[in-house]
């Protein structure tokens, strides 16, 4: 806190300080000298010297000045000399008080008054407790009262709460019952592994008869031994309260409240927060801390000898806490989290509304608050990126809806041999839509030279890749930077070079294909429309992609049709480092979604985990899931409501859809 105007009359001279040293032995020639000397000594904390300028008992006056500083737990005290009125041997001085109540508390400014009388020793302050504050009587003391707000909820789009209210034990003290405040608070802090200083600051200035909550711990983490040890400290007590702490879904997105990880709400918090307050550590809990927590009401009060409030001398009203509305849909979110239990390793699922880009669900298999790769991950999209490059081919004129896009068994391009996932080929009717249907990498790679890196990048940008989405939480829109060279451009056409995406960015691409317009994502409606405008796409070109995606599900992933309705989508596997990425990106009705499973490459020939999770997700949306999803199944154990097959898409062991043997040579289909 920067020095206030007291510096003005402190600077009025070092001569005043010298005068203060002499005045104790010589009569004060004017009331102003007495007032200045008294205020300077009081401000500097030299209470014995200050008491000498009064007509009161020096020990009692010094104690009263010391008590005021401790009762308010002052960080600093500054004064301004006001007008002095004099009538004969009497005078009255006004002075401005600037009392800094400490970190997290406001500054108390008020006007004080002190009467003076001329006597044998010159001018002296006529002492009474009203010198401390005009409204303070002899039998009263000062205190600071602090009342915090109940933490607000985070709600889904239908107003359903997304944060669980936990039973919390508040460890605190009744200051009046403590034999020694510093010793008792320090013992409690050591017992609970906390820093004692912020707790002491709270206790020193608090009304002594009121319970002061200092540290919160989840009820499940408090046992009889801990309660017993705490109860042996004089003045310590506990109370049970309910606090909105734990995210019931999407931990990385909602975030945790301070102390969640260690089952304790820490007093070591930044900003205008007190010991015992709740503070969001990450996610929406952190971003919207002020809205969710509000701010406490602080009052400077006078207390009688029984510790009862006699008057409120100053009050600073806090701001009310409130709820945060999100675009999440609790039922869709539960379906997403339940679906990821089919993934043996880590995985992500993001669902958005096709017409608006509003985020309906964001889930990670790990369930960790630190695992936000559903939004921030940087992954190769594999052939799911064909949704983008197919449009680039159409927009650049490299292909038309009716033109043939040859898809042989393999193609040598720039030193790399491109093959189809299943080793097959399209021998006739090799349109662009059918290349999409059967994930024909050879056909897409062959278009690269005509499409070119600029067209790929331009189309990707129009579908939000690389844009600044301006969500309240960290998110990656991906990037596209295709290097020159036939091989690089061909690899970019199948999402294996120069492009990185997140599951969120792919879900938005699927939404654009479904709706005809790309929309920036929205998570918290109150933030207003996203400044990034919508991008309208060519509907005739989109129809080619939609046809390919619809037929891909019909021919290669019929298990996704179990819940009825029209499902569109593409599946892919791509190696990134030592991880096999399994993708499914598609949409049904007004929900677009992207599933990414990070798998051991050794499991590639066993199961297409993203498609299995997609099937479970669609089933969960259609039929619902339990409120608490079953634990993850690391062994691939089937979750009730999930798909009934563990085979991958298009495995040659079983024909999964109507195919024409003349179209596909070498395998039943080109899917995998």
Report the location of each language-model feature.
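Secretory targeting and sorting signals
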Residues: 2-27
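Conserved SxxK-family serine transpeptidase/carboxypeptidase catalytic domain
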Residues: 26, 80-82, 210-231, 237-256, ...
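Short solvent-exposed beta->alpha transition segments
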Residues: 30-33, 47-94
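Exposed beta-sheet edge and beta->alpha loop/turn motif
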Residues: 86-146, 548
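Small/polar-residue-rich segments within soluble enzyme cores
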Residues: 96, 117, 124-128, 132-134, ...
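Short, basic/aromatic recognition patches
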Residues: 134-148, 152, 331-342
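Beta-lactam-recognizing serine transpeptidase/beta-lactamase-like catalytic domain environment
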Residues: 304-313, 345-378, 382, 392-599, ...
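Conserved, well-ordered alpha-helix/loop/beta-strand core segments that scaffold catalytic motifs
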Residues: 305-347
